[in-house]
Amino acid sequence: MSIDETTAGHIQELRRGTVVLACLVRLRRPDYGYALLESLNALGIIVDANTLYPLLRRLEKQGLLTSEWNTEEARPRKFYRTSPAGEALADVLTTDWRRIDGALAGLTTGDDR
């Protein structure tokens, strides 16, 4: 395995957990899958559609998202929204993210007393 493949693998691993948090936070405002994908990518959270759609279904099955179909437009779209359980998880994950971010900031700046 080359260094580039190794690096890519570690980057993918690092991003994997952040996508759940990003979806839960972003879907506090209801949206459909493709718009969510575009929104996350615009923010620099690069997600592939083949990753996002199964994740949305899994989060819905776990009760962390709710969904409903909007058939008012020419093309029906499934809109997702963070559920109360998803809100609670987002709060826990955000707190932990901030803790980890602070710890890593200390490590990378040499302030890791």
What residues fall within each predicted segment?
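Short, Lys/Arg-enriched N-terminal segment that forms or immediately precedes the first helix
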Residues: 1-12
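N-terminal helix-turn-helix DNA-binding core of bacterial DNA-binding proteins
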Residues: 11-53
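Short, aromatic/basic-enriched loop-to-helix "N-cap" motif that marks the start
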Residues: 49, 75-76
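Alpha-helical DNA-recognition elements
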Residues: 58
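Beta-hairpin "wing" of winged helix-turn-helix
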Residues: 62-75, 81
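Basic, amphipathic "hinge/linker" alpha-helix immediately C-terminal to the N-terminal HTH DNA-binding motif
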Residues: 76-93
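Amphipathic alpha-helical dimerization/coiled-coil segments
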Residues: 88-113
